[in-house]
Amino acid sequence: QPSQDFMRF
């Protein structure tokens, strides 16, 4: 489950 997918630079 992509929980911290917002950290994809």
Curated annotation (Swiss-Prot):
Keyword Protein transport attached: no
UniProt superkingdom: Eukaryota
Manganese is among the record's keywords: no
One cellular component (GO) term of this entry: extracellular region
Residues with Pyrrolidone carboxylic acid modification: 1
Main location: secreted
Subcellular location: Secreted
Cystine residue pairs: none
GO biological process: neuropeptide signaling pathway
Residue list for modification Phenylalanine amide: 9
Keywords: Amidation, Neuropeptide, Pyrrolidone carboxylic acid, Secreted
Record-stated family: Belongs to the FARP (FMRFamide related peptide) family.
Task of the protein: Has modulatory actions at skeletal neuromuscular junctions.
Protein's name according to its UniProt entry: FMRFamide-1
